[in-house]
Amino acid sequence: MIKHNLCPFAKEAISKQVTYRVFDGGDTDPFSSPSGALKSLTKVLKEELSELEAFDGDGATSFIIAPSMFSGDFQKYMDFVNDDVSDLLTNLDLHGTIQVAPFHPHFMFGGTNQNDPGNKVNQSPHPMFHLLREVEVSAASDQQDTQKIWERNERLLTKLFRC
């Protein structure tokens, strides 16, 4: 991501306040009790969202990595993001304040096929949630033409992965 400048905003963020949190299922085995693990994951997301909102410096960002959750099921992961995470942002009154960017080993943007090189931008070794403050995303977007970034990334990823 940083080496190839896929996200020009990432390099600066890495030098600031970054939190990485690995979620292993909490007190619940995600395989024997998936609903309990989802509740635990939602609790971790809520805690991290609250901490990110309360942080008063610049450049704060958080990653919640969930290697034992959703790894084989991209659709369930996206359902969780679109339903549960969205509801959590609403309940905490954080829509427009914090956004959650989804990353997954099998990530696919809507309207693309599995081999589309643009999907690589949001693919990761494990399912994870990237929490970003909107004010910083907006400031970074104001400094860059995001459409040109996307087009450049697609060309680069096509070249790198020969898709």
Regions found by a protein language model. Give the residues of each.
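Expand to "…catalyze enediolate/carbanion chemistry for C-C bond making/breaking, isomerization
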Residues: 1-163
